[in-house]
Amino acid sequence: MIEESLNLIMPKRIDRRDFLRAAGPAVIAGPELARAARPWAPKPNTEPATEAAPRLLTGCCAYSYSKLLGVGKMTMEQVIRKAVELGIDGVDMTGYWFKSTDPAYLASLRHLAFKNGVCFSGAAIGASTVQAEPGKRAQVLEDIKKWVEVTESLGAPHLRVFAGKLPAGATIQQAVEWTVDTLKAACEYAGKKGITLGMEDHEGITQNSDACLEIVHRVGSPFFGINLDITNFIATAKADAYAQIEATAPYATHTHVRDRFADGQAVDLDRVWQIFARANYKGFMSAEYEGEEDPSAGVPKLVDKIKALCRKYSSV
């Protein structure tokens, strides 16, 4: 049962370059993804005690070590110890490589993190809310609820979720409706436990900032926002990746950082940090390494860039 449950959250990863090659110009500039911008009002600040300055915290996703975790050369316990070596503020516990969701195992991870002064910035699963069949959507909702409980057991405040790719014959608007309905219910459950859900701009309908904003506003929960991966938006004729990052940064609940886009072009990380600073973002800037180098060499290099920029643009 444990293995079956963990398989539900592990998406089949598609290389970003392969996705763009296979999708072609129709996806990059098509009318469904390149939707007209909607007149969403700026996100109001309803928390008068909130400091009016950015607080950019350093982090790393367990996913950065996927090459090692996936073949059993690393454990989640070692990910926690790596966070100590890297000198970061927190680690995002990607759920794909948990040995189980048994309470004793989760308690052991939480205790190990505490003893080493490591904060869990969140957890992450891969269940997709874009499901045409009501029964499948109900199963996804139950899976999210289960992982809200796992997140609570870890003592983490945030859970990353996906919307997903468009099924054959479905429209973007149908997918948005399915996602809104599922995530409204999920946020109602998560909010009672103080857990915030962050929908990642990952593969499919959320690779366009306007779709992300529509979902966020329609879900309408203080316990919901965007787990913003800075390299996942597909540029359109109206908005490049940076414009879409700027549009969604005020709604970011957690941020995943890479230093290259899918086409291999370098990300202007300084420009990205300026965007988050202007948005008064308060949260983690977590390395999610996918480079060619072995993670033991590549992750520290990316983390060093993150540290330098957080020092430059953060109030902490």
List each language-model region with its residue ranges.
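Short active-site-proximal "capping" loops at secondary-structure junctions
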Residues: 65, 96-100, 128
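Metal-dependent catalytic neighborhoods of phosphoester/phosphodiester hydrolases
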Residues: 101-107, 134-137, 171, 296-298
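Charged helix-capping and loop-helix junction motifs
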Residues: 74-76, 105-108, 137-144, 173-183, ...
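Conserved beta-strand positions in the central sheet of alpha/beta enzyme cores
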Residues: 92, 122-124, 160, 256, ...
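Glycine-rich, proline-tolerant flexible connector loops at the mouths of alpha/beta enzymes
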Residues: 92-110, 166-169
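Receiver (REC) domain switch/active-site residues of two-component response regulators
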Residues: 89, 157, 253
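Active-site acidic/histidine proton-transfer and metal-coordination neighborhood
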Residues: 23-33, 45-50, 110-122, 129-226, ...
